[in-house]
């Protein structure tokens, strides 16, 4: 993994004609809602921590005018190459870095940017990654059991985890990240199967998980039995929750007053992390409820702009069924000493802790 500008990454510069066409036709999820949340302004500096195929970034560039700039990050060199092509009309005002979004500060520092006016992350696996069998994210087409978003980084492929982890580790991963009630049966089935030879392909793993499920579960389930296992392994391989936590730890310090943060998630675990973090950062107190008087001295740093997560409209779902699980949450950075919106007093909270009008985000 490198924090260098993408021009130093040769893999990103070499993309297929089919990939370039996919980038041109790509319509990003919740596009109108993201633009409303970020409210890009002319001349602003913005961060897209997961540029992907560049759809959100292109829409941002259209709104920030000739003096605006955008910093684009992605850990997938293929995606970066496609994004460079899509965003080429804006030339040097778009800056590309091959890095994890959690490491965004190194990119901003290289650009000499202290703060930005808005930041967006759209986390999880992309449609392009799912559809490329050789990436190993999906069981719909057979391919190597890889699942790495950055194949040039230091992450180990999913095959290593599947073939080396103990039954307890596998069970914990599938239960924690996949929330699969059959986690124990699946973990044991994987360990038993690999005793006969390594598990190297997505089809092999999907078949093992399918057999581990009771017949009545397979008959009544709306999804393939391997769906949650594949999700869990992908999240573990790419440290997806850890990346999100580290990003949220630092991003508010790099937002200008009035700057906006928008986060799109596709999994309840991710959404829960974002929800709770924005809720805490919008409060003047984060002491435990057992404390009768505020002792933490915490000051509200954001206004939460989305009381509930924003989801796709029926019209968008008709165009893109993969948007069905997308959730957008957004917040606006408060200036030092700026009071948040009027807040409702919570009589059960310690003195000094209130809730936003309309309830906690």
Curated annotation (Swiss-Prot):
Q: Which GO terms describe its biological process?
A: rRNA base methylation
Principal subcellular localization:
cytoplasm
What are the start and end residues of every segment in region (Disordered)?
318-361
Chain intervals with Basic and acidic residues compositional bias: 348-361
Alphabetical list of InterPro entries matching this protein: RsmH, SAM-dep_MeTrfase_MraW_recog, SAM-dependent_MTases_sf
- Annotated catalysed reactions: cytidine(1402) in 16S rRNA + S-adenosyl-L-methionine = N(4)-methylcytidine(1402) in 16S rRNA + S-adenosyl-L-homocysteine + H(+)
Catalytic EC class: transferase
Query: Binding residues for S-adenosyl-L-methionine, per the UniProt record?
Result: 54-56, 74, 101, 122, 129
Q: Where in the cell is it found?
A: Cytoplasm
Q: What does this protein do?
A: Specifically methylates the N4 position of cytidine in position 1402 (C1402) of 16S rRNA.
What the record says about family reads: Belongs to the methyltransferase superfamily. RsmH family.
Protein name per UniProt: Ribosomal RNA small subunit methyltransferase H
* Protein species of origin: Nitratidesulfovibrio vulgaris (strain DSM 19637 / Miyazaki F)
